[in-house]
A protein has these predicted regions:
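C-terminal substrate-binding/catalytic lobe of Rossmann-fold NAD(P)-dependent dehydrogenases
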Residues: 134-140, 149-313
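Rossmann-like NAD(P)(H) cofactor-binding subdomain of soluble oxidoreductases
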Residues: 88-154
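Short beta-strand element of Class I
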Residues: 26-30
Length: 313
């Protein structure tokens, strides 16, 4: 019997749990939150859609009862405050570091073999914090960001091409931030045809720019962080792990020399399966892409330094 847990029953966490249930990714999905009644209410609401939508997954909600999460295969951490308009992901670090560290430690008491998927922002830094504070092997700590950024990239590509997003392949690597992500336009394709042969350089650059500010654009429109795509991206990562699909998905993972970088978690393509990260895929980058990746890594390192400043590491 497979089991997934989502910690944090806010917009992103509840969306992730809902997608996991609807797609029957696990036999049981547990939602845990600190706010009394919220996860229980949302779980009940979801279960009342089971007959309408035709899924058999059981969704359970609980308030701060980590015993309910016992023996989870995969745990998604969405806990923390959401990003407010004008706030950078990095400004969240002081608050969210303490929350994420506490959650991860409590989860492992009851699910010592669980694979952790981190969504909390700043995502690369929270993934790094989890890895360093827990001492788990690096294949078991995964940051979701690249899956979301790549989905946004494919959306903007499909809009420019006038096609379905499922007909487009595209990948975003680097940090999960407005200035640190690197949409790899050179490798994007539509039905196997390089997008660079179908769109002008100017249009392609517009797509890249829109992708990079995709999260901030939604925050301005919504007044808070987006939740449908982030929650779905988290569920997408969980599905590849629990179902051992061996999908290649860009995720924030710990590097030890890959792409010329070490001692940080940053977005690169990986193969996801039952062991979490089955393999880090090293792409052959151009000189320009290598330079952008090095700058992105430097920015992530700088944000990670704040963990020591706030006493989280």
């Amino acid at each position: 019997m497979s089991k997934g847990t989502v910690v944090g029953a806010g917009n992103v966490g509840a969306t992730c749990a809902n997608v996991l249930a609807f797609n029957e990714v696990a036999d049981e999905v547990v939602m845990l939150d600190v706010k009394e009644g919220v996860s229980e209410g949302k779980a009940m609401d979801m279960m009342q859609t089971a007959q309408l939508l035709g899924f058999d997954t059981t969704v359970v909600g609980c308030t701060n009862d980590y015993a309910q999460t016992a023996n989870s295969d995969v745990v998604v951490i969405t806990s923390g405050i959401p990003r407010k308009p004008g706030m950078t992901r990095e400004e969240l670090i002081g608050v969210n570091a303490g929350i994420v560290k506490s959650v991860a430690q409590n989860i492992l008491k009851y699910s010592p073999n669980a694979i952790l998927v981190v969504i909390s922002n700043p995502m690369d830094t929270m993934t790094y914090l989890s890895l360093k504070s827990l001492g788990l092997p690096k294949n078991r700590i995964i940051g979701m960001g690249g899956a979301l950024d790549s989905s946004r990239f494919k959306y903007f590509l499909s809009q420019a091409l006038g096609c379905n997003a499922n007909e487009v392949e595209g990948m975003v690597i680097g940090g999960h931030g407005d200035t640190t992500m690197i949409p790899l336009a050179r490798l994007a394709t539509y039905k196997g045809i390089p997008v660079s042969k179908l769109l002008s350089a100017e249009k392609l650059q517009e797509v890249v720019a829109s992708t990079m500010v995709g999260g901030a654009t939604l925050t301005k429109l919504l007044g808070t962080s987006a939740w449908y795509a982030p929650g779905a991206a988290g569920a997408y990562v969980v599905e590849s792990i629990i179902h051992n699909q061996k999908k290649m998905v860009p995720c924030s993972v710990y590097l030890e020399g890959e792409y010329g970088e070490s001692d940080l978690c940053i977005g690169v393509p990986v193969i996801l399966g039952k062991n979490g990260i089955e393999k880090i895929v090293e792409l052959e980058l151009t000189a320009e892409e290598k330079e952008l990746f090095a700058k992105s890594a430097a920015a992530v390192h700088k944000t990670n330094e704040a963990l020591k400043e706030v006493g989280a590491l």
